[in-house]
Structures are given as structure tokens and as C-alpha cells.
Amino acid sequence: MNIELRHLRYFIAVAEELHFGRAALRLNISQPPLSQQIQLLEQQIGARLLARTNRSVQLTAAGRQFLQDARAILLDVEQAASRAARLHQGEEGEIRIGFTSSAPA
């Protein structure tokens, strides 16, 4: 299974908009490739994430769970990238300070 971060972003946009056209506008891509990518994601996962009709899109139970997990994954990736950047710039790190008493008793 090879799920790309962009697939998670695409799914989140469709899940939040509940409309492929609006999600495509939000993502600045055309609607047909967005639909294809969501179908590919569903095939990779092996579960239907969205219930589609001619006029609407609804999340399935699997889709609701996947939405929560996808949001958490993207947040983790963003936080990891931010921490790595701060460490690289010296803004974050770990300092250990030790103390030994050598005063006579």
C-alpha cells in the first residue's frame, strides 16, 4: 500500500466539503482527477470511504474513521517537520544540567 500525503489532503477536502467540485476548487485541481485519486485511495484501502449519489457525497462509517486518522497523520507530519526545522535552526533541543556537591560534611 502506497498512500501519499496528497491523497490524504484530497480525501479531507472532499470529506469536509461533501462535494467533489467544491473540494477540487479548494485544492486548485480539476474535478475528474480528484475523483480518480479518491477512487484509487479507496481501492488501496479496500474500503468505500464515500457514498456518492448524483447530487451529494456522504461519508461512510469507514470514511468517518479514516477522516479522523487522516487528520491526525497530517498533523503528526506537520509537527515532525516543524520540530526538525527548529532543531536544525538551533531553536529547540535538550540541555542536561548536573550538580555534584563537594562540600565536606
Report each predicted region and the residues it spans:
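Short secondary-structure boundary/capping segments
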Residues: N2, L49, R86-H88
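N-terminal winged-helix
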Residues: Q31-P32, Q36, S82-A105
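N-terminal short secondary-structure element
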Residues: M1-Q37, A51, V57, F66
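A short LG(V/I)-centered, amphipathic sequence patch enriched
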Residues: E42-L59
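Alpha-helical linker/hinge and terminal dimerization helices associated
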Residues: Q44-I45, F66-H88
